[in-house]
């Protein structure tokens, strides 16, 4: 059932909003609204997985923590479970990876951005019993990649300000249960290319990236994609051609009904691969 990705600065109040949302969803389930009486709501976060805040000081430990979080989400996603992923989720590539997981499970998803000024996060953090170390807090806020509702993996996007009374539960329920998406503005709609051209670009772009990996995997663990700032971070284990082709087919299956230009496709595929490779380390 639905995946709710909560994102925001550290100490921005994400867990408070997640608990608030959990209660609101459970109230509706208790009332059997939309025949949901057999549903349940679960929150997955650093606390439930015993991930210490010091983990975010070293990139290797942080990658392992993201892998743990991703695996927990995978286990809990089911046809009768609301999964609230209450974590930093500050890397767009990881949010895209979670989006792909929800797509593969044929379920809905949304992103909730808990938008709180940095100064207020610092204040909240200083008042915590177990705060983030100051340097870790600053690093995480600096690296934060804010959700963008114009991208498919960050949409539908709900932004909750620090002084908002509550999350927009009615809208969230409609998106997750009734699958009602906000109608895009005509000025911002992407006109889809002819289907045959799009599928050709999807096939060619992904194949080009695979060939780039095969041509360079023996020389470096960080491959720069020509003509862009994109980098492919290879895992410590050997990446075989069958694995790459399987991931390529999975990506194509997820995106064949969409419409993106070549540059966006390349970025999405690189983000997808980086997310998958992280789970292999």
Swiss-Prot record:
It is found in: Cytoplasm; Nucleus. The keyword ATP-binding applies. GO terms for cellular component: cytosol; nucleus. Keywords: ATP-binding, Cytoplasm, Nucleotide-binding, Nucleus, Transcription, Transcription regulation. ATP binds at residues 8-15. SUPFAM superfamilies: P-loop containing nucleoside triphosphate hydrolases (SSF52540). GO terms for biological process: tRNA wobble uridine modification. Its main location: cytoplasm. GO terms for molecular function: ATP binding; ATP hydrolysis activity. Pfam families: KTI12. It comes from the Eukaryota. The keyword Cytoplasm applies. Belongs to the KTI12 family. Interacts with the elongator complex. Elongator complex-associated factor that is not a structural subunit but rather transiently contacts the complex. Required for an early step in synthesis of 5-methoxycarbonylmethyl (mcm5) and 5-carbamoylmethyl (ncm5) groups present on uridines at the wobble position in tRNA. This is Protein kti12. It comes from Schizosaccharomyces pombe (strain 972 / ATCC 24843) (Fission yeast).
